[in-house]
């Protein structure tokens, strides 16, 4: 994985975490709603979209993929400091790079 791909996966993973928090859904539900083709499109657009705010891009993704509000809350009951959506995105992008076979990164993102 080259540096651009690392940055793209970091961005998309952080975006998924951001959307999950905003809509109170599990990350897996967000990934399922977007689908493999949608993830590939987000990766393709990541270099441009990272110049926009997460709020704007997430609003567009939520509307386009018709992601509904859920009731999953991972934040309010925590006793410790909560990692930011960027921290979680970085963690997931590292896991994808470490675990995925070459050419199967999108499938790995969907599994994680």
Task: Describe each region flagged by the PLM.
Residues 1:
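Active-site helix-to-loop segments that bind/position phosphate- or nucleotide-bearing substrates
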Residues 11-18, 90-94:
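A general alpha-helix detector
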Residues 14-62:
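N-terminal interaction modules that seed assembly of large macromolecular complexes
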Residues 32, 46, 73-76, 106-110:
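Short coil/turn segments at secondary-structure boundaries
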Residues 40, 60-71, 94-101:
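Amphipathic alpha-helical interaction surfaces
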Residues 48-84, 88:
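Long, compositionally biased
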Residues 77-112:
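A charged, amphipathic interaction segment
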């Amino acid at each position: 994985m080259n540096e651009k791909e690392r940055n793209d996966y970091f961005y998309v993973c952080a975006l998924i975490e951001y959307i999950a928090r905003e809509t109170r859904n599990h990350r897996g539900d967000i990934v399922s709603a977007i689908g493999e083709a949608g993830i590939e499109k987000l990766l393709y657009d990541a270099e441009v979209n990272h110049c926009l705010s997460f709020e704007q891009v997430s609003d567009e993704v939520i509307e386009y993929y018709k992601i509904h509000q859920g009731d999953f809350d991972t934040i309010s009951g925590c006793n410790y400091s909560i990692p930011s959506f960027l921290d979680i995105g970085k963690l997931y992008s590292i896991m994808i790079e470490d675990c995925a076979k070459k050419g199967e990164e999108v499938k790995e993102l969907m599994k994680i």
